[in-house]
C-alpha cells in the first residue's frame, strides 16, 4: 500500500471526518462541481536520507491536505477533525509503518470565483519503506 493510499484510508476511518465529509477525499484536486465539504490531498515532496550503506529506508514526505467547504466555519470544523486524527500520530496505517506525522503548517484560502473556503494543512510524515 502506498503512503497516500494508507493516509486516505486512515483519515476516512475517523467517524468525525466521515460524518462531515463522507468519503470525499480526492488525490491532487477536487472533481468538477464537487459536493462540499471535501478534501484534496497531494504529496509535495519526499526526502530520502542516506548513510554509508545507502538509503536509510526512512523517507519523509511533505503532504498537503486542502480542506474545502462552502463556509469558513465548515472548513475549520473539518480541518480540526483531520488535524486531530493526524497530528502527532505514529503507528500503523494498514501495512505502512509511520514513525511520525506532524502538522507543520496551516493556512486559510478562499476562491472568490466559486465562494469556496479552505484550510490548507501541511504534514511531514516519516515512514518505513
Label every model-predicted segment.
Residues 1-55, 73, 77, 89-97:
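Small/polar-rich, solvent-exposed N-terminal microdomains that initiate assembly or binding
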Residues 26-28, 42, 66, 104, ...:
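Residues in well-ordered beta-strands of folded domains
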Residues 62, 79, 101-104:
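Solvent-exposed, well-ordered amphipathic alpha-helical segments
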Residues 84-129:
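Acidic-leaning, charged glycine-interspersed low-complexity segments
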Amino acid at each position: 500500500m502506498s503512503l497516500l493510499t494508507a493516509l486516505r484510508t486512515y483519515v476516512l476511518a475517523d467517524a468525525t471526518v466521515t460524518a462531515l465529509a463522507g468519503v470525499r477525499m480526492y488525490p491532487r484536486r477536487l472533481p468538477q462541481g464537487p459536493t462540499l465539504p471535501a478534501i484534496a490531498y497531494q504529496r509535495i515532496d519526499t526526502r530520502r536520507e542516506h548513510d554509508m550503506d545507502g538509503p536509510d529506508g526512512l523517507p519523509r514526505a511533505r503532504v498537503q491536505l486542502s480542506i474545502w467547504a462552502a463556509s469558513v466555519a465548515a472548513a475549520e470544523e473539518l480541518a480540526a477533525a483531520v488535524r486531530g486524527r493526524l497530528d502527532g500520530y505514529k503507528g500503523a496505517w494498514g501495512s505502512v509503518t509511520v514513525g511520525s506525522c506532524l502538522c507543520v503548517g496551516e493556512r486559510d484560502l478562499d476562491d472568490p470565483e466559486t465562494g469556496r473556503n479552505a484550510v490548507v494543512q501541511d504534514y511531514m510524515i516519516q515512514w518505513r519503506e
